């Protein structure tokens, strides 16, 4: 059975049958077991725990999102950890663990009474979207489409004839007279960049190495982690000097942000972690970057990284990401799956036509395609930190080293360069305006309109420069707010999909506040699908303003998931929010004859037995409808006198239309038992019980 994880505080809605049965709610057992608590106000979800799938996260640290920084100190003490990174811009800290696994840290944290903590999550594993090093095939471009030929590749550089990608996207020397990305800062969030390469001299400004909190001086070799970032940087902004190659935006400046560092220093594959990626993105944003290139990704949904991306876009930064090299349809990879980004597929040109590259990931989030096959660009020199080899047959006279790579990692920087050029012409453009301009002016070479392979088609800089900047057709942020039926608490970890008629889609998950944020998306008509919560996420249930000590909010029933759909919802500057109220139904019926017991009653309690929400006389085959309650409840049977023998009490819970057998054992000498589908399972201890609960949203 799938585990569905959900938490909420109880809304004190007492059914009519309870209110007339025992208005004082006096307990039948000791006060410490069933203390009277007639009302609990809804507090919402207090701590959200990121998913832990084997092999998809790294050990050694946890990331904590907070509202109250002082509460973080309790976590640090409990896990015997050390704060190694502070991100006040998004209210996140990174805590290094000392000999403790992430799962063990979760267990320690769930035992605390905390206020003001939003989430705890691991750092997920990410990979560079590794390119293939290729030897150029001289016959590859012999059969040419009219207008795509070597004589048109005159960029005044000695290797102009190799730059088929620039020609394909409409770059000309005349175009650069209008705009070349002059003074636009481009953050290459990647391995480091060799700023001493002859084609990058003067192009690389100060950057940042977040894992070591080190500012990288302008013009230096920072190619920690390998050659990937240098190749990306050359495609974007290699200088125009008559030698070597030239980038799409030779007037732009490169800001290296090293997130794939030296594996010998940071471990693993060199990935510094979601926390340091967030630090790098924030640093780049705060230091003037206007567009960022991300040619990397992975599977885990990181709230920290999502907030960093949102932070950048809120400050007007355009985020360009590679679609990936997985060939098949790929969904829920990040950062490509975050809303508001420009996701780029890789294209090839062969036999007189363009086509999607065989390795390029297909996705319902692809925006545009760009050249990604046999791309010549800069690589670190032989004496450089990140030297990984070069193509010795490239006839450059400037002493620089070059190589041919292919992958969506090579496609994305073509688009990033295009964005830099456009931002020179449209310096106040919002991220959604730039993306929409690219999509509106793309070359739909296969005539399909938008598709999973190439998005809206091949990006065309010449057309985009001539096209007007859209003033309509986008919103700066759209929100989907998911709450219980009464709107008392937000529901986190709910997946929200926004699908358009053409099949393209945006995805996001609700955060601890129950809000899914979609920054800088297109306006228009969407079919919106809401479902969850995500069964891989965990949370702590709130209680009277604090998290329940030990309350790992595990609801073990698929039937507790809720879904909602909104067909034809119009998103516009005047309609930037959708409110979704989940609702539930829950009825209980017992089949066991309890006539031998003294005054048995059906009792609804909170999972810690701190409060009695209602009671009524027990009756066999009577339906008890709890559908007006919202939050987490447990229930059981209580008698006036102890049972003489063990009695197994059986029944059925009908939860959202699904029948679930339940039972509990009233042991000899006791007066009560919890009833559930696990036989009254106590996740806590006798002195601090935590019973399996039922999560419902009310009506």
UniProtKB/Swiss-Prot annotation:
Q: What is this protein called?
A: Fervidolysin
Regarding domains, what does the record say?
Is composed of four domains: a catalytic domain, two beta-sandwich domains that may mediate interactions with substrate, and the propeptide domain.
Any keyword Hydrolase? Answer: yes
Source species: Fervidobacterium pennivorans
Gene Ontology BP terms? protein autoprocessing; proteolysis
- Removed propeptide positions: 22-149
Instruction: Indicate the secretion signal residues.
Output: 1-21
Which Pfam family, an example, fits this chain? Fervidolysin_SD2
Uses, biotech or industry: The thermostable keratinase of F.pennavorans is a promising enzyme for application in an industrial process. Native feathers produced as waste by poultry farming could be converted to peptides and rare amino acids like proline and serine.
Q: Name one GO molecular function term.
A: calcium ion binding
EC numbers listed for it are 3.4.21.-
Q: How is its activity regulated?
A: Is inhibited by phenylmethylsulfonyl fluoride and 3,4-dichloroisocoumarin. EDTA and iodoacetate (1 to 5 mM) have only little effect on the enzyme activity.
């Amino acid at each position: 059975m799938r585990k569905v994880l959900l938490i909420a505080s109880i809304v004190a809605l007492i059914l009519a049958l309870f209110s007339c049965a025992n208005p004082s709610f006096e307990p039948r057992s000791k006060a410490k077991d069933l203390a009277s608590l007639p009302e609990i106000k809804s507090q919402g979800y207090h701590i959200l725990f990121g998913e832990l799938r084997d092999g998809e996260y790294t050990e050694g640290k946890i990331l904590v999102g907070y509202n109250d920084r002082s509460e973080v100190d309790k976590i640090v003490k409990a896990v015997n950890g050390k704060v190694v990174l502070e991100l006040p811009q998004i209210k996140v800290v990174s805590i290094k663990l000392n000999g403790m696994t992430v799962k063990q840290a979760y267990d320690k944290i769930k035992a605390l009474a905390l206020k003001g903590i939003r989430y705890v999550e691991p750092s997920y594993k990410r990979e560079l979207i590794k390119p293939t090093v290729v030897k150029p095939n001289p016959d590859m471009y012999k059969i040419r489409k009219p207008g795509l030929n070597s004589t048109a590749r005159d960029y005044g550089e000695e290797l102009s004839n190799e730059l088929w990608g620039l020609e394909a996207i409409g770059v000309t020397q005349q175009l650069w007279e209008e705009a070349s990305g002059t003074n636009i800062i481009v953050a290459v969030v990647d391995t480091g960049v060799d700023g001493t390469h002859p084609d990058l001299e003067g192009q690389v400004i100060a950057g940042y190495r977040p894992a070591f909190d080190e500012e990288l001086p302008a013009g230096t070799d920072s190619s920690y982690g390998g050659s990937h970032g240098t190749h990306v940087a050359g495609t974007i902004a290699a200088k125009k000097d008559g030698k070597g190659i030239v980038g799409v935006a030779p007037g732009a400046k490169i800001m290296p942000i090293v997130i794939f560092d030296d594996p010998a220093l940071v471990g693993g594959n060199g990935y510094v972690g979601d926390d340091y990626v967030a630090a790098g993105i924030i640093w780049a944003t705060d230091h003037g970057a206007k567009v960022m290139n991300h040619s990397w990704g992975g599977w885990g949904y990181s709230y920290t990284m999502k907030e960093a991306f949102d932070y950048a876009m809120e400050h007007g930064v355009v985020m360009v990401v590679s679609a990936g090299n997985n060939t098949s349809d790929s969904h829920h990879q990040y950062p490509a799956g975050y809303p508001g980004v420009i996701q780029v597929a890789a294209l090839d040109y062969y036999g007189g036509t363009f086509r999607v590259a065989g390795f390029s990931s297909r996705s319902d989030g692809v925006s545009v395609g760009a050249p990604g096959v046999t791309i010549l660009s800069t690589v670190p020199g032989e004496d450089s930190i990140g030297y990984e080899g070069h193509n010795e047959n490239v006839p450059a006279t400037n002493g620089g080293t070059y190589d041919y790579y292919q992958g969506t990692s090579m496609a994305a920087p073509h688009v990033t360069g295009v964005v830099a050029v456009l931002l020179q012409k449209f310096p106040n453009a919002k991220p959604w305006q730039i993306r929409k301009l690219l999509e509106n002016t793309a070359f739909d070479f296969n005539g399909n309109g938008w598709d999973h392979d190439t998005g809206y088609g091949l990006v065309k800089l010449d057309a985009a420069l001539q096209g007007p900047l859209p003033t309509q057709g986008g919103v700066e942020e759209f929100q989907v707010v998911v709450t219980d039926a009464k709107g008392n608490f937000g529901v986190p970890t709910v997946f929200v999909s926004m699908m358009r008629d053409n099949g393209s889609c945006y995805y996001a998950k609700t955060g601890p506040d129950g809000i899914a944020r979609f920054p800088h998306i297109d306006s228009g008509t969407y079919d919106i699908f809401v479902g969850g919560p995500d069964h891989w996420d965990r949370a702590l249930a709130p209680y009277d303003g604090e998290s329940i000590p030990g309350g790992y909010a595990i609801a073990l029933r698929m039937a507790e998931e809720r879904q909602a759909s909104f067909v034809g919802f119009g998103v516009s500057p005047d309609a930037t929010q959708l409110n979704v109220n989940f609702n539930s139904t829950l009825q209980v019926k017992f089949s066991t004859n309890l006539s031998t017991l003294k005054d048995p009653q059906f009792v609804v309690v909170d999972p810690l037995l701190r409060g009695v929400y209602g009671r009524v006389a027990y009756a066999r085959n009577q339906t008890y409808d709890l559908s007006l309650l919202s939050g987490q409840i447990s229930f059981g049977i209580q008698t006036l006198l102890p049972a003489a023998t063990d009695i197994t009490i059986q029944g059925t819970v009908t939860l959202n239309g699904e029948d679930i057998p339940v039972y509990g054992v009233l042991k000899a000498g006791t007066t009560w038992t919890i009833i559930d589908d696990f036989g009254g399972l106590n996740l806590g201890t006798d002195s601090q019980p935590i019973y399996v609960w039922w999560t419902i949203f009310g009506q």
